[in-house]
Amino acid sequence: MDFFNPFIDPTRGGPRNTVRQPTPSQSPTVPSETRVCRLIPACFQTPGRPGVVAVDTTFPPTYFQGPKRGEVFAGETGSIWKTRRGQARNAPMSHLIFHVYDIVETTYTADRCEDVPFSFQTDIIPSGTVLKLLGRTLDGASVCVNVFRQRCYFYTLAPQGVNLTHVLQQALQAGFGRASCGFSTEPVRKKILRAYDTQQYAVQKITLSSSPMMRTLSDRLTTCGCEVFESNVDAIRRFVLDHGFSTFGWYECSNPAPRTQARDSWTELEFDCSWEDLKFIPERTEWPPYTILSFDIECMGEKGFPNATQDEDMIIQISCVLHTVGNDKPYTRMLLGLGTCDPLPGVEVFEFPSEYDMLAAFLSMLRDYNVEFITGYNIANFDLPYIIARATQVYDFKLQDFTKIKTGSVFEVHQPRGGSDGGNFMRSQSKVKISGIVPIDMYQVCREKLSLSDYKLDTVAKQCLGRQKDDISYKDIPPLFKSGPDGRAKVGNYCVIDSVLVMDLLLRFQTHVEISEIAKLAKIPTRRVLTDGQQIRVFSCLLEAAATEGYILPVPKGDAVSGYQGATVISPSPGFYDDPVLVVDFASLYPSIIQAHNLCYSTLIPGDSLHLHPHLSPDDYETFVLSGGPVHFVKKHKRESLLAKLLTVWLAKRKEIRKTLASCTDPALKTILDKQQLAIKVTCNAVYGFTGVASGILPCLNIAETVTLQGRKMLERSQAFVEAISPERLAGLLRRPVDVSPDARFKVIYGDTDSLFICCMGFNMDSVSDFAEELASITTNTLFRSPIKLEAEKIFKCLLLLTKKRYVGVLSDDKVLMKGVDLIRKTACRFVQEKSSQVLDLILREPSVKAAAKLISGQATDWVYREGLPEGFVKIIQVLNASHRELCERSVPVDKLTFTTELSRPLADYKTQNLPHLTVYQKLQARQEELPQIHDRIPYVFVDAPGSLRSELAEHPEYVKQHGLRVAVDLYFDKLVHAVANIIQCLFQNNTSATVAILYNFLDIPVTFPTP
């Protein structure tokens, strides 16, 4: 390499003649106490040479920028990034206004008394909770506010004779090495949120000075026959709920004590205070200048896809793209890389002599450069686990030293485990935990928000941004890197562009704003929104609502009965409908049922417990007959449902926000308002699911089953009401004449969870469009109580109804809407999609084909053999004949013949191994090529190999192109015939095999059926 490398002989360097060596004043000091074994690419000594060179040295981490050399770390507490983030700020003495983006719970013990103000020393004896509020001040300085005196507590109902104090003391003494804590007990009277109950119970409130022992104490009490409540509530939730605070937003501190000694964070400013000194400022919605870092790593992988535990598979480059929230300036672009690198336009390049030095720079950037949010693409599954593995297994970095805080620091990635007992592995996500940093993996976000054939960054960028990656195969990276500064610049440019695309995606979706609004509404830390599911969101809100009514929440025992009858449908009547089909939807169906019927834990009376409430008359409750027997819910005049109250408040707030949004002109405020209303919508819809998960935080399957039961009944009642409306009655209900044919009628042809498909036979489109909303409103007012509401959602001009959740039709605006058909399935290849689409277009838009479809739809399956195909239907056969010729002539591109299937679990966990995508995975593995990640979609093409099982015909499309392999013509054509049959089977009594046989019967081609 052409700059001075302090770890190897520079005379055996890279391709340039000039060797940049530091002047004597630049020469590094060598701390004798730090000895590191650095791994250096062997190509730095001998151009093109593979492998690494191990050098044992005491040099401090070093970087180069142009002719300048510097040290990554400056002194004991600094780094290059600390000096670049600006001047140190002076701490205010009496008044502090600051914004919080994250809250971290830590525990101080008595040996820390000298580190904290005298007034808080007794709060940490023997231990005490300290909440670290991380954020920015008004002038943009990073700040950590250490909040003392926040207690955690739970409740217990102890049987007669249990000495509570003795049990707690015994449990604390056997604390298994955990920090001891102070505790106190207090008798209180509370209602229990489990079922309808007018009684208040004498329970003990157990308050702890810190939380590490809470689980131990709770378990011990349970063992002694006590029932415990709310022992699953942490100190952060108590802090937010008990004092009306928030996990994200502006705070005012009236008595901040600056901490200048014994600093416990890496922020610019640090203060100590009590929770009593804080005041939340809800009216302020603007963001401070938070920094978002988008990063990407490139690795060597000389023997195949990189393996972090192999010395030679080192990280060679890390791109860092930074954006300041509220700043429209171009991104700050940096490239950290090994060896020399040619300049890149608009990119600040840092050159490092070894991987160790580069990792030191990147990790210290996370800590010292005021980065609050990090993003990337698949960083939870690849980039961060790879960095962690290199830093801790190859080197000896203490990653806890590179977060925002010191006490209680965490820097790790929790990855789901597979296995036959893996539970919800397929739905689980890797969780990034870095204290004081909010991770946003845009791979996970895009999988949630988009429906694509695959979720590679290139595919997503094309779809969302209209741009492509500067793609380089991982196989090309090692030779480019070894080739010298020019090759490393090409890899670096590719690396930087990836980070730019990810930042663009984040800003397009405004994911950081969305998760902050959900965090505020759900009262959970922002970093938990994307990975911790919806249960914790509803739980926090229910906890708050329960507290205001004097309720305490039980802790589930884990023995809940799972399973209940979920949402069912009105069976579809398959066929082709050339009359208008009106689709009506229940607005917010499940939330509205909870509100309308006053459903809640607090209003529930199990079927065998009604006799315990003799004061109730039949008018005081509503009865529902579930699969396990009847249950009852008291009506609102006896007790209002807590869940319904929550929903009512949320929905009223959403309505108000949307009204404000309509007249808002400030773009930043508009984004925040839009994400607020979206957060409310998502959380409202999660309430039903919260009750219906048997393994959830507070399951109540009686509520969930009642909701779905009412949903079914509402569909059935709506069907009966609408189908009974004659043209004359419709005119009477509308109070005006309606243009219809004499035999006009309504027929419900399908009902799906919250919607009805009504075929308006004998009505024209204009008439249906005219009365659609009124018909929905009349049905609502006649059948249902508020706030249940039926709305006209859409009208089909014609509809091909296949089976449940599978239909395709032309809407009133002439657009085609498809659901569940092969055309839009991720597993279908483009050739099959395009040809099927051509057939579908004929059926939906070509008059002669429409007429043929309508005629066939009313006949027996064997009718076409007796009468022949109607004239219009021959056009479909012609499309299939032409498609076969294209396949035989090899005129179909390989890309159009590519299928994709998701790798849903580790390979070893598949019971059936002879699946096409698994075959390709195994072939890639055998060739030591890049392996897909869990949840990636694996592409494959079927090639011509007579006598093999179908799964063995699968091959990666790039391999097919490189080797010019022939595709399996008959197999692809058979897939096309079956895809077309799936679309038109509703014309033939929904008999797929009969439809396939009919198509083959009328085709004009020689066919060899593929091996099954």
UniProtKB/Swiss-Prot annotation:
<dbReference type="GO" id="GO:0042025">
    <property type="term" value="C:host cell nucleus"/>
</dbReference>
<dbReference type="GO" id="GO:0039686">
    <property type="term" value="P:bidirectional double-stranded viral DNA replication"/>
</dbReference>
<dbReference type="Pfam" id="PF00136">
    <property type="entry name" value="DNA_pol_B"/>
</dbReference>
<feature type="compositionally biased region" description="Low complexity">
    <location>
        <begin position="21"/>
        <end position="31"/>
    </location>
</feature>
<comment type="similarity">
    <text>Belongs to the DNA polymerase type-B family.</text>
</comment>
<dbReference type="GO" id="GO:0000166">
    <property type="term" value="F:nucleotide binding"/>
</dbReference>
<dbReference type="GO" id="GO:0003677">
    <property type="term" value="F:DNA binding"/>
</dbReference>
<keyword id="KW-0255">Endonuclease</keyword>
<keyword id="KW-1194">Viral DNA replication</keyword>
<dbReference type="InterPro" id="IPR006133">
    <property type="entry name" value="DNA-dir_DNA_pol_B_exonuc"/>
</dbReference>
<dbReference type="InterPro" id="IPR050240">
    <property type="entry name" value="DNA_pol_type-B"/>
</dbReference>
<keyword id="KW-0238">DNA-binding</keyword>
<feature type="region of interest" description="Disordered">
    <location>
        <begin position="1"/>
        <end position="31"/>
    </location>
</feature>
<keyword id="KW-0235">DNA replication</keyword>
<comment type="subunit">
    <text>Forms a complex with the ssDNA-binding protein, the DNA polymerase processivity factor, and the alkaline exonuclease. Interacts with the putative helicase-primase complex subunit; this interaction may coordinate leading and lagging strand DNA synthesis at the replication fork.</text>
</comment>
<dbReference type="InterPro" id="IPR006134">
    <property type="entry name" value="DNA-dir_DNA_pol_B_multi_dom"/>
</dbReference>
<keyword id="KW-1048">Host nucleus</keyword>
<dbReference type="GO" id="GO:0003887">
    <property type="term" value="F:DNA-directed DNA polymerase activity"/>
</dbReference>
<dbReference type="InterPro" id="IPR017964">
    <property type="entry name" value="DNA-dir_DNA_pol_B_CS"/>
</dbReference>
<dbReference type="InterPro" id="IPR036397">
    <property type="entry name" value="RNaseH_sf"/>
</dbReference>
<keyword id="KW-0808">Transferase</keyword>
<protein>
    <recommendedName>
        <fullName>DNA polymerase catalytic subunit</fullName>
        <ecNumber>2.7.7.7</ecNumber>
        <ecNumber>3.1.26.4</ecNumber>
    </recommendedName>
</protein>
<dbReference type="GO" id="GO:0004523">
    <property type="term" value="F:RNA-DNA hybrid ribonuclease activity"/>
</dbReference>
<keyword id="KW-0378">Hydrolase</keyword>
<dbReference type="GO" id="GO:0006261">
    <property type="term" value="P:DNA-templated DNA replication"/>
</dbReference>
<dbReference type="InterPro" id="IPR006172">
    <property type="entry name" value="DNA-dir_DNA_pol_B"/>
</dbReference>
<dbReference type="InterPro" id="IPR043502">
    <property type="entry name" value="DNA/RNA_pol_sf"/>
</dbReference>
<keyword id="KW-0540">Nuclease</keyword>
<keyword id="KW-0548">Nucleotidyltransferase</keyword>
<comment type="function">
    <text>Replicates viral genomic DNA. The replication complex is composed of six viral proteins: the DNA polymerase, processivity factor, primase, primase-associated factor, helicase, and ssDNA-binding protein. Additionally, the polymerase contains an intrinsic ribonuclease H (RNase H) activity that specifically degrades RNA/DNA heteroduplexes or duplex DNA substrates in the 5' to 3' direction. Therefore, it can catalyze the excision of the RNA primers that initiate the synthesis of Okazaki fragments at a replication fork during viral DNA replication.</text>
</comment>
<keyword id="KW-0511">Multifunctional enzyme</keyword>
<dbReference type="InterPro" id="IPR012337">
    <property type="entry name" value="RNaseH-like_sf"/>
</dbReference>
<dbReference type="Pfam" id="PF03104">
    <property type="entry name" value="DNA_pol_B_exo1"/>
</dbReference>
<dbReference type="InterPro" id="IPR023211">
    <property type="entry name" value="DNA_pol_palm_dom_sf"/>
</dbReference>
<dbReference type="InterPro" id="IPR042087">
    <property type="entry name" value="DNA_pol_B_thumb"/>
</dbReference>
<keyword id="KW-0239">DNA-directed DNA polymerase</keyword>
